[in-house]
Amino acid sequence: MRKPKITVIGGGTGIPVILKSLREKDVEIAAIVTVADDGGSSGELRKNMQQLTPPGDLRNVLVAMSDMPKFYEKVFQYRFSEDAGAFAGHPLGNLIIAGLSEMQGSTYNAMQLLSKFFHTTGKIYPSSDHPLTLHAVFQDGTEVAGESHIADHPGMIDHVYVTNTLNDDTPLASRRVVQTILESDMIVLGPGSLFTSILPNIVIKEIGKALLETKAEIAYVCNIMTQRGETEHFTDSDHVEVLHRHLGRAFIDTVLVNIEKVPQEYMNSNRFDEYLVQVEHDFAGLCKQIPRVISSNFLRLENGGAFHDGDLIVDELMRIIQVRK
């Protein structure tokens, strides 16, 4: 019997939670990962290697999907100290991906090589073969370029789009990305930052078109917390409305919403300063937009913060897959 094909789309902070749990299931996994990051280590590497697709999100996804021993993982994720000169703040894995990207001719090729080396469960694809610049247009008409600058701009985001950083052309999807979406049984969007992790992938025209054409079940994992500079005062219905608006029509089949209350002591603004308050529920608004709304306890409290429980999310996704068979 053919294994179900599940493709997860997003960034390197949110989707590893899902990918780690999917590895335990009898499914074929693919991850499509944003390449619009221009902050931190990825941003510094982009300044010095203009052809480089930012490696940070890809690094985290690689670790989540690999069978590397814990020591290898620590080495790959090791971040140089602030007194390390030119290497300060860079994770070793980012430097390895950057070096292999140059050696192999592209980040796509580098990720395929690293996936074999670390025995990943599934395929990892950058959403584009070129570094992208994320642009946010705010409701007052002002525009900000660069993912790392968007959250600091006051006001509400109206929409976002991406350009090829190298020449401002309309970006193309990376190899096999469109085919992977069209051949999937399920597409999972998120969890992760709405405007800076999920949308930078799906506003690539070829990817957006594939999402509208695929016969796969499309599930969106709604965020638990609102995010500073992105989704302040958003309900869960608002998140879905933004996704649909960016592709021009409704395309999500299922939304998964956490209804477990986050204890006040886990709303740690000192440690997680980008997260504000728990997302409010608007089930009437969701039901107008989505055929299936699954609300349950998907909460995991860990390290002083509130996160999605990957096992609970994936168990629900597997139930949906079984119903579709």
Where is each model-derived feature located?
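Non-transmembrane, aqueous-exposed alpha-helical and coiled segments at domain scale
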Residues: 1-6, 20-23, 28-31, 119, ...
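Gly/lys/ser-thr-rich phosphate-binding loops in alpha/beta enzymes
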Residues: 1-55
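Short glycine/serine/threonine-rich phosphate/pyrophosphate-binding segments
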Residues: 14-19, 196-203
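A short helix->loop->beta-strand "cap" motif at the edges of active sites that frequently abuts
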Residues: 27, 214-218, 290-291
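Electropositive, gly/pro-rich neighborhoods at or near active sites that engage anionic ligands
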Residues: 36-156, 316, 323
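Active-site gating loop/helix substructures
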Residues: 130-195
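Charged helix-capping and loop-helix junction motifs
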Residues: 201-208, 234-239
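C-terminal functional extensions of proteins
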Residues: 233-325
